[in-house]
Amino acid sequence: MPKYTEYFGNRKLPRGIRNNNPGNIRWGSPWQGLVKNGKLQDASFCLFTDAAYGIRAIAATLITYYDKRKAKDGSKIDSIREVIERWAPPNENNTSAYANQIGKVLNISPDSETLNLHDYRTMRALVEGIIRHECGDPKQYGVTPHNNVNEWYPDEVIDEGLRRAGLTKPVTTVAAVPATKTTAAAGGAVVV
């Protein structure tokens, strides 16, 4: 897959997009895919070599919350509100509006304690909702949106970021059709 770096460094775009860091993750962890000497370009927020590494960092952080961190009340982090309170603390963000927006993306209440962040579809929707919230509407910046929730990146880039975080897209299987004279004839020679 080619690196998705189309927006890297473009100062007219949101910081998360131009840094290939659509979750606006701050410097701290030694993430895979960091730009060497990136702190010289942005002292606060990570710069990734491509967007899939930035997406990987979002997913890896959320999995860590789910597996190893606790909500404010000491329980497991398993609701949208608990994830967002950790991701975007209220001292810097309107966490209620953020959680409500993500709830609409996932089509569940922000307080429903049913999230499984090891589930590909759940994580994908959560990551795309975060990208959309953190980076805004691409049309505001004259960028043609992609036909998905985040609108900034094509599906392949999201899939690659999630794959790098250890989440693979489920494979759709088709039920086997029993062989009969009719079905065998449709595919070629029949042995009777």
Specify the residue positions occupied by each region the protein language model found.
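Cell-wall polysaccharide-cleaving catalytic domain and substrate-binding groove, primarily
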Residues: 1-191
